[in-house]
Amino acid sequence: MSNSHPLRPFTAVGEIDHVHILSEHIGALLIGEEYGDVTFVVEKKRFPAHRVILAARCQYFRALLYGGMRESQPEAEIPLQDTTAEAFTMLLKYIYTGRATLTDEKEEVLLDFLSLAHKYGFPELEDSTSEYLCTILNIQNVCMTFDVASLYSLPKLTCMCCMFMDRNAQEVLSSEGFLSLSKTALLNIVLRDSFAAPEKDIFLALLNWCKHNSKENHAEIMQAVRLPLMSLTELLNVVRPSGLLSPDAILDAIKVRSESRDMDLNYRGMLIPEENIATMKYGAQVVKGELKSALLDGDTQNYDLDHGFSRHPIDDDCRSGIEIKLGQPSIINHIRILLWDRDSRSYSYFIEVSMDELDWVRVIDHSQYLCRSWQKLYFPARVCRYIRIVGTHNTVNKIFHIVAFECMFTNKTFTLEKGLIVPMENVATIADCASVIEGVSRSRNALLNGDTKNYDWDSGYTCHQLGSGAIVVQLAQPYMIGSIRLLLWDCDDRSYSYYVEVSTNQQQWTMVADRTKVSCKSWQSVTFERQPASFIRIVGTHNTANEVFHCVHFECPEQQSSQKEENSEESGTGDTSLAGQQLDSHALRAPSGSSLPSSPGSNSRSPNRQHQ
């Protein structure tokens, strides 16, 4: 027996879902005029409708049709202005069925439809229509779409329009839609640093807009032109004959151009957020340095002593360097570089940016710091075309090596102090390329692996002999640090004493915590005046159980959320006797010149206990 019913959506047993049938039946009321009790007139076309359905779907119609006004009278005819019959037909279909077909409609109808969704208070429809408009943006429709998105404060659609116009600035300037922009929308576009068309083209487009919009204030429009970015020839032969700018304004622009540093001019640049633009895709190339081809190939795994990096000799006058030319002037505030890290060497360096290869501005200065592996660098946003990395020191030889280079604009928030990042998250992690360069452990970086649960008498900690050596952590790059947190080995009731020092070069050390006269157990929170740090040295001075200082976990800066989690979890711990367990010292490899420490249980002078 055939089934004439359409396929129904799957529902759970015991649940009935016939919403699609309801939509079809209510939608059928639109076909005829049965039961209609109100009529809308749009562009002389009559639209019969049903008050109760409109009121149930829309607060606007509820107030209009049941608010005691003239429109609430039986069989009323309501004329609607500022819309089209096509758009209103789509809206009624959506109200009655919850469906709308956008793909076959012209952009003008879709924008009218979006306007109705906004006017009558259908936020979900507004969002869905905006999302579709984002997918069909082109040179012909982007300006009128931006105008509507700005008028109704639609952030996602506005942002997508801006990104499209930024990447197609010159084509947008010459489009017919540009001439139809409102003054507010026009200024919002051309005032953006990322609207990166030549200033002469922007001036000519604004001049053309002024001719088509003669009633607007032309002086206000022309203030958006960045005259100092134009050449003397352009100012005299293009701007001056237009008569829209005073001779004083032109002379002021010439003065600024001649007296200012080039990098102080208010340049425009391409903006592509969260995407590396130092790639062949965007036309970037390495123009100075040795072994240029390796730097931008994207390979951050296959490199060794012989290949996979770019380099330059380190000289005293810093004339050598590695220079990257971007495909076009771009706005950046974030650079990532991978320093060669197949051994324990460290480097020092600085980074400068320029528009013309003559005037350079230093955005990163790590020339006095020791750095290794991945460098995650942030600075105030700059427009630049050229980027120069100059190595000033290598702890092994006189060559500076870089494996990879990336640059971009990021919307990620960051805080800078004295040119260094003030980290909010723990940067003493393996993922952030921190490492333990002094101290003994079964696993080299057990101190930094984030495991604060799985440790016992034999493993899970880093240690050093009291009176000999220390535990030293090297961060990948200098940070402004004002706190650290330690977990001292606490599988019994012993206590420790210690002090903490920080350094940027392993030569000069500053003590930030002195707990040599304090009995310390388990979690240690250390706060101090914020200062630059690349190295943190923890020196144990006393252990009530034996002659070894043991540390399970290290982080900086201190992570408050994890502190609370640890406190809540520790409240349920218990004790178990583990007398007689010893560390297999043959599993450890002590640094040269250091004596091999014993396990926490060796020479114990206190009861042996361990967390369950």
From Swiss-Prot:
Record-annotated BTB domain positions: 36-104
Pfam families in the cross-refs: BACK, BTB, F5_F8_type_C
Xref: InterPro entries: BACK, BTB/POZ_dom, BTB_POZ_domain_cont_9, BTBD9_BACK-like_dom, FA58C, Galactose-bd-like_sf, SKP1/BTB/POZ_sf
Disease in which the protein is involved: Restless legs syndrome 6: A neurologic sleep/wake disorder characterized by uncomfortable and unpleasant sensations in the legs that appear at rest, usually at night, inducing an irresistible desire to move the legs. The disorder results in nocturnal insomnia and chronic sleep deprivation. The majority of patients also have periodic limb movements in sleep, which are characterized by involuntary, highly stereotypical, regularly occurring limb movements that occur during sleep.
Amino acid composition bias (Polar residues), ranges on this chain: 573-584
One of the protein's GO biological processes: serotonin metabolic process
Cellular component terms (Gene Ontology): cytoplasm; glutamatergic synapse
Protein name in UniProt: BTB/POZ domain-containing protein 9
Organism lineage string: Eukaryota, Metazoa, Chordata, Craniata, Vertebrata
Region (Disordered): 560-612
SUPFAM superfamilies: Galactose-binding domain-like, POZ domain
Listed Low complexity bias regions: 588-612
Alphabetized PANTHER family for the sequence: BTB/POZ DOMAIN-CONTAINING PROTEIN 9, BTB_POZ DOMAIN-CONTAINING PROTEIN 9
Tissues where the protein occurs: Detected in the brain (at protein level). Moderately expressed in all specific brain regions examined. Expressed in the dopaminergic neurons of the substantia nigra and A11 neurons. Highly expressed in kidney and moderately expressed in all other adult and fetal tissues.
Domain BACK: 142-240
